[in-house]
A protein has these predicted regions:
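Short, low-complexity disordered leader/linker segments with a strong preference
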Residues: 1-49, 72, 431-434, 438-448
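Extracytoplasmic "Venus flytrap"/periplasmic binding protein-like
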Residues: 65, 69-143, 174-177, 182-185, ...
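Extracytoplasmic/periplasmic substrate-recognition and gating elements
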Residues: 68, 72-73, 78, 176, ...
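Long, aromatic- and glycine/proline-rich binding clefts that accommodate carbohydrate-like moieties
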Residues: 75, 143, 310-311, 360-413
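Hinge/lid segment of periplasmic solute-binding proteins
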Residues: 110-165, 222-224, 306-310, 377-384, ...
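Extracytoplasmic/periplasmic solute-binding protein
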Residues: 150-159, 164, 174, 188-241, ...
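Conserved C-terminal helix/tail region of periplasmic/extracytoplasmic solute-binding proteins
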Residues: 174-175, 180, 199, 394-448
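Glycine-centered hinge/linker elements that transmit conformational signals in sensory
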Residues: 193-195, 237-266, 312
Length: 448
């Protein structure tokens, strides 16, 4: 289903305090269990430390109020929130684990859960899940739940995720004679639409219809073309130089040749945030982007900015609207003093009510399936916001998560350097992916 949205001035009537009473319910169910796990004794609260990189804006406001709700709704666990800057949080976490003084709960990358579990940097939480009757599995989207396991034991709980989609300028569509209610459905149509949207004055491009590598990588288009198979398949086999992936890289190179590297580089030099965003400013007609990009439009686009959202187009009709997603999980670092209390807080953060609240204030795609479903028709979201969540929920059905293989944790540079060589004209797409295939196969062999 295609979601078509129009900019509204009042996008969200929900306020942070409005959901406080509702959130007490999410915590209430965990009080007795926390007591059973001896989280607190003699009437004293167990103090735990929670690290994340949400340091400003709506996410910080939301998480701080969620923590306050948790702390005041029960008398056994007290959570202290510690902001750590993006990039620093994980190096500091490793240092704290090595020093024997880690935080109690931390937000971590969803694609590297197995690496941390294998390295004994995180805590096995399987026993806590089993004590709850294995009810957690049904809470989350299946492809997210699969990421938290190492050797059949869970080491994390999924928190949020994302998915890549197309944003397109509906007014530009009308100007170019395109139907604004019918975005491109295949790669062939995407090319046709982009050519119609292009505006050129002499040798100068006033508008570029679409360029596939602005905001997405070649890896996303490769899996889109290859039936959702990324550089590795589900069995861990290296699948870099498949025919479809070679065709995908050739397709990307054709886009670069059409506009020219100089044009692409000069456009990129003009890109910025806010009103300088190339999609908002009209420099680009169609933009492939994480669906959370919607928050940027809410904050910076004019009130009358008229845009649509659609799935990434199929490689060819019937091949599937495959997309890529990432996300984050909640983990208990190895050596945390109070894992029972930590797990209770993690359950709270992934409960339906709390996930709804965080989603309402961030437009993150939450890991809790029921929370996302509720947000589709949530009364505190306007029609536009509800449509974004409906689009996200549907798109997750064809969204692929790509956990880093244990036998090739450092494979990405080997692939990227070959793709870069092709983009620079030093080798063909076939040569680039053949070389990447050989290099990664060698890496896997070394790590057997």
């Amino acid at each position: 289903m295609i979601i078509l949205v129009k900019r509204r001035k009042k996008w969200l009537s929900f306020t942070l305090t409005a959901g406080a009473a509702l959130l007490l319910t999410a915590c209430g169910g965990g009080n007795e269990e926390a007591s059973d796990n001896n989280a607190g004794t003699d009437g004293e609260k167990v103090s735990i430390e929670f690290w994340s990189f949400w340091g400003s804006g709506l996410r910080r406001d939301a998480i701080e109020e969620i923590i306050e709700d948790f702390n005041t709704s029960q008398d056994e666990i007290e959570v202290e929130y510690v902001y750590q800057p993006w990039g620093d949080i994980w190096t500091k976490s490793l240092a704290s684990i090595a020093a024997g003084d880690p935080p109690d709960v931390i937000v971590q990358d969803i694609n590297s859960v197995q690496q941390r579990a294998e390295a004994e940097q995180s805590t096995n939480i399987q026993e806590y899940i089993e004590q709850d009757g294995n009810e957690m599995e049904s809470t989350f989207y299946p492809h997210l739940w699969e990421t938290v396991f190492y050797e059949d034991n869970a080491y994390a709980l999924p928190f949020n995720t994302d998915t890549q989609v197309l944003f397109y300028n509906k007014d530009a569509f009308e100007e170019a004679g395109l139907d604004p209610e019918t975005p491109p459905a295949t790669w062939e149509e995407l090319e046709e639409y982009a050519r119609a949207l292009d505006v050129k004055d002499g040798n100068s491009w006033e508008r570029i219809g679409f360029y596939p590598l602005w905001n997405l990588g070649a890896d996303v288009w490769a899996l889109n073309a290859d039936n959702g198979v990324s550089w590795f398949d589900k069995e861990g086999n290296v699948k870099i130089n498949t025919p479809k992936k070679v065709e995908a890289l050739e397709w990307v190179l054709e886009w670069q040749d059409y506009y020219g590297p100089e044009t692409i580089n000069s456009y990129e030099a003009e890109f910025g945030n806010g009103v300088a965003d190339p999609f908002i400013s009209g420099l680009v007609g169609i933009r492939a982007q994480n669906i959370n990009y919607y928050t940027n439009l809410l904050e910076n686009a004019p009130e009358d900015f008229n845009f649509g959202v659609a799935p990434l187009p199929e490689y060819e009709e019937g091949s599937g609207n495959w997309s890529w997603g990432g996300g984050f999980v909640l983990e208990i670092p190895k050596g945390a003093e109070n894992p029972e209390a930590s797990y209770e807080f993690m359950k709270y953060l992934t409960s339906t009510e709390v996930q709804e609240k965080f989603g309402l204030n961030s437009f993150d795609i939450m890991a809790n399936q029921e929370a996302n479903t509720n947000l589709i028709e949530h009364p505190d979201l306007d029609e536009e916001g509800q449509m974004i969540y409906e689009m996200a929920d549907r798109n997750l059905e064809s969204t692929v998560i790509t956990p880093v293989p244990l036998k090739a944790p450092d494979f990405s540079p080997l692939v990227n350097e070959q793709i870069d060589g092709a983009m620079l004209g030093n080798q063909s797409a076939q040569e680039a992916l053949d070389a990447a295939q050989a290099s990664v196969e060698n890496l896997v062999e070394q790590n057997q």
